[in-house]
A protein has these predicted regions:
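Short, acidic, small-residue-rich periplasmic hinge/interaction motif at the N-terminus
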Residues: 30, 44-46, 89-93, 111-155, ...
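Short, acidic Ser/Thr/Gly-rich low-complexity loop/linker segments typical of extracellular
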Residues: 50-74
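A short, solvent-exposed loop/turn motif at the edges and junctions
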Residues: 51-53, 75-76, 83-101
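Short acidic/polar hinge/loop motifs at secondary-structure boundaries
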Residues: 195-223, 278, 282
Length: 937
């Protein structure tokens, strides 16, 4: 014990001597009432201005007395700035957080001893009428360049899942597909404990992980396994959202079971199991429902009629995963199984008006039913030998069977009704997909001032699709009176093969200043298609017909065999910048990036269709060049400015350059164009600036411009006498697009209980289409200019169990055409509403409600210019200490919901209505349970 005291004293003496050149801060932490030392406490240093974390954890050392007992708990740290105001933050389980303000002046020399120890008070919850007094937690803070959300600071109703927690996090948005953005930047992957989950299927985790199991959610740029294995920055870091569980849920298992039933024959059942050992994670999810619903009453997402489900979907699914990771993360193995069975009913109405002579109008109504079964198997393996090599494989096998039927009624008008058509269809098919990737990354011997790396990758893909279709057409022409009935039957087969080896060589300066690589990736692909068309006298699939040769339509039956030899050659160079050591630890960040990719294509198409039997070849060189620059305001990684300039070419299908004619579908003719150019091209410039230095204020500004020297559009001609539309691809040049926007997040008030989030953007699109006007033989380029302005946001107040949010969103579109007889169009969509949630303190009963007015103006159909007030509400009650939750939900109580899409281009305007999920009430019963392993096991 004496020896330890001597070492401690010498250590303190050395630190004190070094303080003559730079100040050191000495402090103590203790129980505020008993004055006893608390060496287990965690002490952090924050900037007083915005609570940014400067030092996450300072070691707290025990100071022993002569009798061997602990007399004090001391900490020492060196301030990073000469003049600054800091906030010392101490935490310990069972105690309220303690804070102490510390002001440092550049004139301070030597050691500084805090006048008062950091005193922590034990948490004592006490009832004051209906109020419970507890410590207040900070919702979000920065730890280095990592944005950390403290899940314990969010007050959500019992039974809430991870998705509801994420929707409440400031600066975070999430759409119905589970795609998450933080301060306008899209998250690459949602992880659990810094590991991928269900092969990136975020919705499983979002909808099934109880929020009460979460401790922190961290958002940061994650280093890749390759960078870790090679000890160099060879790949760009990924922007991830990492869900960290509380310690008590990191072992054992977590399980949920939910059952629900409602009006309109709505029902739902699901179960979830998540189990952990030291190195292995097991996950199992089962779901059966006909709800197809992702709305959350009182949530932060601005849901609109356009984002409503556009079909009635019934789904049965089972997903399972076994994930192993060694303690040093050098061996990783993942096995994944996924089965989905679905039934999809869709109803759609469409109004399509063309901007050609006579303004022909097409009205259609369609009903369809599709069934699908999908089985997916996947296995990933990775082995890392640090500073030596990395090897990984990925195997995926998918099988799908599907069938369906459809009915469509369409009517064409030119001043009056000219044609009526009824279509009935059937289809049945199956497909296989197999993918195998293998990557080998050995590390080469270093050069004098450079590190060099080399790796080889292999990609192998195979796809097969077998499909049969049958259609019946009934056409009633009122201009040239006729009544025609016909039948089509298709036998379709497609096989695709793809092989791609890749060789990569790169060098990296040892001072982390320069990095460059060259990459060669030759590939071969083969796409074989057989599509035979028959004309029977009844509605049957080809497998049910006899004497197929006698009813074959040779002009619309074809065999296609496309072979593509491609070589991709990429050169990349970057110049790094090192941010100051005292702020960000000397991390390298890209300053300038240059990339040039050349793609050499040789295509060989053997195409036979009726009397057309041709062998077409094409040689194409494609260019993809880009320069990206990155700057940081005041060398701060949380305030970057990104600028990108580039030019990109992409190939067009070789089939478009074949002079074929396809009139298999009545009233529709499709033609090829031998004069079509073999590629599209785009020039672009983009700028983006974000500032996330403060937990109170974030902002984002972006702008972009793109110009298309070469594009492909579909020309269309309409014959009002026969009712036939003819489509042909044509090149156009000169379309462009400009956009700019800004996003601001501001938090204020006591305990930051107020949040304002606003997103503004506008864009201008100059759209060109090559249109053949009625009565003319040559194409004419038609232009439409569309200017769109959008602004949306919310203001929220949250304190304890109360959450109130007011939202507003408006989008205005103005379109002007350069062709004759174009009527200027103005369309406005706007909505505004109020949502609220309150939890009774004692009963923990939660009431949620949301009311929104959705309005539309300027649509061509008067039936779409409406005001719809949508009201939703729910009530939930926990039992058994929150393990059992009952919830009643009511959607669209006033029966106002609809789903409408609106589109304008140079050819016309299209308004589409989908049958959305009907209004309904639904009762849920949810049970959560977990079990931890016994101590000592």
């Amino acid at each position: 014990m004496t020896f330890k005291r001597i070492i401690t004293s010498l250590f303190a003496l050395l630190l004190t001597l070094s303080a003559y050149s730079q100040s050191l801060i000495f402090g103590k932490v203790q129980d505020a009432f008993l004055k006893t030392p608390l060496p287990e406490a965690k002490v952090s240093v924050l900037l007083a201005a915005d609570s940014t974390v400067v030092i996450d954890s300072i070691p707290v050392r025990k100071k022993h007395g002569s009798d061997g007992t602990v007399k004090a708990a001391e900490f020492i740290f060196k301030p990073e700035r000469k003049t600054c105001k800091y906030l010392l933050h101490a935490t310990l389980a069972g105690y309220e957080d303690a804070y102490q303000l510390l002001a440092i002046d550049e004139n301070d020399q030597g050691a500084i001893m805090l006048d008062h120890p950091l005193g922590l008070r034990r948490i004592q919850e006490r009832q004051l009428g209906e109020a419970m007094v507890t410590a207040t937690r900070i919702k979000m803070f920065y730890k280095g360049d990592t944005l950390v959300y403290d899940a314990r600071a969010f007050k959500l109703p019992d039974g809430s899942m991870l998705d509801e927690l994420i929707r409440q996090m400031p600066g975070v948005t999430m759409n119905s597909n589970g795609v998450i953005s933080v301060n306008g930047r899209r998250v690459d992957e949602l992880q659990l404990g810094s590991r991928s989950f269900m092969r990136g299927n975020s919705k499983v985790l979002l909808e099934n992980l109880p929020y009460y199991t979460v401790k922190h959610i961290k958002v940061y740029e994650q280093d890749t396994d390759l960078n870790r294995a090679m000890g160099a920055q060879l790949e760009k870091k990924r922007f991830v959202m990492d869900v960290n569980l509380k310690p008590e849920y990191q072992r054992g298992y977590i399980a949920n079971v939910e059952a629900a039933g409602g009006t309109e024959e709505r029902w739902l059942g699901r179960a979830f199991l998540l189990s952990f050992t030291d190195k292995t994670r097991y996950a199992l999810s089962a779901n059966s429902n006909n709800v197809n619903e992702s709305r959350h009453i009182g949530g932060s997402n601005h849901w609109t009629p356009q984002s409503m489900p556009n079909s009635l979907l019934t789904t049965h699914s089972v997903k399972g995963e076994i994930d192993y990771q060694s303690s040093d993360k050098n061996v990783q193995e993942n096995l994944n199984v996924d089965f989905i069975s679905s039934r999809n009913e869709k109803e759609m109405s469409r109004r399509n008006e063309l901007f050609v002579t006579g303004n022909p109008l097409n009205l259609s109504h369609q009903n369809s039913l599709g069934k699908e079964n999908v089985l997916k198997l996947g296995n990933k393996f990775k082995y890392i030998k640090p500073a030596r090599l990395m090897f990984d494989t990925d195997l995926a096998v998918d099988y799908k069977s599907y069938s369906g039927n459809s009915f469509m009624l369409s009517e064409q008008y030119v001043d009056s009704l000219t044609l009526r058509q009824r279509n009935v269809g059937l289809n049945d098919g199956s497909s296989w997909k197999m993918k195998f990737y293998a990557h080998y990354y050995p590390k080469l011997k270093d050069l004098e001032n450079w590190r060099q790396f080399f790796w080889v990758k292999t990609f192998c893909d195979y796809q097969s699709d077998e499909n049969q279709q049958a259609q019946r057409f009934h056409i009633n022409n009122l201009v040239s009176p006729s009544d025609i009935k016909s039948h089509n039957a298709n036998d379709y087969s497609n096989k695709k093969y793809f092989v791609r080896p890749l060789v990569h060589y790169c060098i990296d300066s040892k001072d982390t200043t320069y990095y460059a690589y060259i990459e060669a990736a030759p590939s071969f692909s083969r796409n074989q298609t057989k599509d035979w068309l028959y004309h029977p006298d009844t509605l049957l699939l080809p497998s049910e017909l006899d004497m197929l040769q006698a009813i074959t339509d040779p002009a619309n039956s074809y065999n296609s065999d496309l072979r593509t030899y491609k070589g991709d050659y990429t050169f990349y160079f970057t110049r790094y910048q090192i941010l100051p050591d005292e702020v960000w630890g000397g991390w390298p960040r890209e300053l300038v990036e240059l990339q040039l990719k050349l793609s050499s294509l040789r295509e060989r198409l053997n195409y036979q269709r009726g009397s057309l039997d041709t062998l077409a070849t094409r040689n194409t060189l494609l260019i993809d060049a880009a320069m990206r620059m990155h700057f940081y305001v005041r060398k701060n990684v949380q305030s970057p400015v990104h600028i990108a300039v580039g030019y990109r070419e992409t190939e067009t299908p070789l089939l478009n350059q074949i002079g074929y004619r396809d009139d298999a579908t009545p009233l529709v003719v499709r033609l090829g164009n031998p004069n079509l150019k073999p590629y599209n091209s785009t020039c672009y410039i983009e700028m983006r600036h974000t500032d996330e230095r403060s937990r109170r204020h974030h902002h984002l500004i972006d702008a972009g411009f793109s110009y298309n020297p070469i594009q492909v559009s579909q020309s269309v001609s309409f014959n009002p006498t026969s009712g036939v539309y003819t489509y042909r691809p044509e090149n156009v040049s000169g379309s462009y697009y400009f956009s700019t926007g800004a996003k601001v997040l501001q938090r204020f008030g006591k305990n930051l209980c107020w949040t304002v989030d606003n997103l503004f953007n506008c864009n201008f699109r100059h759209s060109l289409d090559h249109t053949l006007l009625a009565g003319e033989t040559e194409s004419h380029v038609s232009a439409v200019n569309t200017f769109t302005v959008h602004d949306g946001g919310y203001i929220q107040y949250e304190k304890g169990g109360l959450n109130v949010r007011a939202t507003a969103d408006v989008r205005w579109r103005h379109s002007e055409g350069k062709m004759r007889d174009f009527e200027t169009l103005n369309a406005t969509d706007f909505n505004y509403g109020l949502s609220g949630r309150y939890t009774l303190p004692r009963l923990k009963t939660t009431f949620s409600a949301e009311g929104k007015m959705f309005s539309r103006r300027g649509y061509g159909s008067t039936g779409l210019n409406t005001d719809d007030f949508v009201l939703n509400a729910s009530i939930s009650q926990p039992f058994l200490k929150g393990k059992l939750v009952a919830r009643l939900e009511a959607f669209d109580i006033l029966h106002q919901l609809s789903s409408t899409q609106y589109e304008v281009n140079a050819q016309g305007r299209i308004e589409t209505w989908y049958r959305s999920l009907p209004h309904y009430f639904m009762a849920h019963l949810i049970y959560h349970f977990n079990k931890n392993p016994k101590k000592g096991k």
